[in-house]
Amino acid sequence: MAVVDLIDLPAIAPPNTPLVGLDLGEKTIGVAVSDATRMVASPLGLIRKTKFTDDAKALFKLMESRRASGIVIGLPVNMDGTEGTRCQSNRAFARNLLRLREDLPIAFWDERMSTMAVNRMLVGEADMTRARRADVVDKMAAAWILQGALDRLRNL
């Protein structure tokens, strides 16, 4: 399988199975999971980045435990719509995952402003300190990304 358009993901990923959302950071990978009906995304956890094969094994283990059938990866598009080096890095991550699991459907979702929005929410509504936010922002951003993709799929 290859990277697919988000709108094609429901036809490829088996029905009534969750999807996983990823926020790829420099040091961590934020992970979120949807419910089986693909209506609600919830933060699941963090994978502390080491080497790619270990990161992928940890991700696949999380996916198997939730019976997830596809991945939505946040794509950090620049504000002007262009793709920079972080987009290239996220696309390379997806290609590398597909080398290990060829049957895995992967789609991208524009994650512009997701981390900023989550930080504002955690400061404004949850009144979290910077240290505490660091522990949750990536998995919350992954949930934000996945929820945006789920909302888009629901409104097709």
UniProtKB/Swiss-Prot annotation:
InterPro entries: RNaseH-like_sf, YqgF, YqgF/RNaseH-like_dom, YqgF/RNaseH-like_dom_sf. Its EC number is 3.1.-.-. GO terms for cellular component: cytosol. Pfam families: RuvX. GO terms for biological process: rRNA 5'-end processing. It is found in: Cytoplasm. It comes from the Bacteria. Keywords: Cytoplasm, Hydrolase, Nuclease, Ribosome biogenesis. CDD domains: YqgF. It is an enzyme of class 3 (hydrolase). One of its GO terms (molecular function) is nuclease activity. PANTHER family: POLYNUCLEOTIDYL TRANSFERASE, RIBONUCLEASE H-LIKE SUPERFAMILY PROTEIN. Could be a nuclease involved in processing of the 5'-end of pre-16S rRNA. Belongs to the YqgF nuclease family. This is Putative pre-16S rRNA nuclease. It comes from Phenylobacterium zucineum (strain HLK1). The lineage of its organism: Bacteria, Pseudomonadati, Pseudomonadota, Alphaproteobacteria, Caulobacterales.
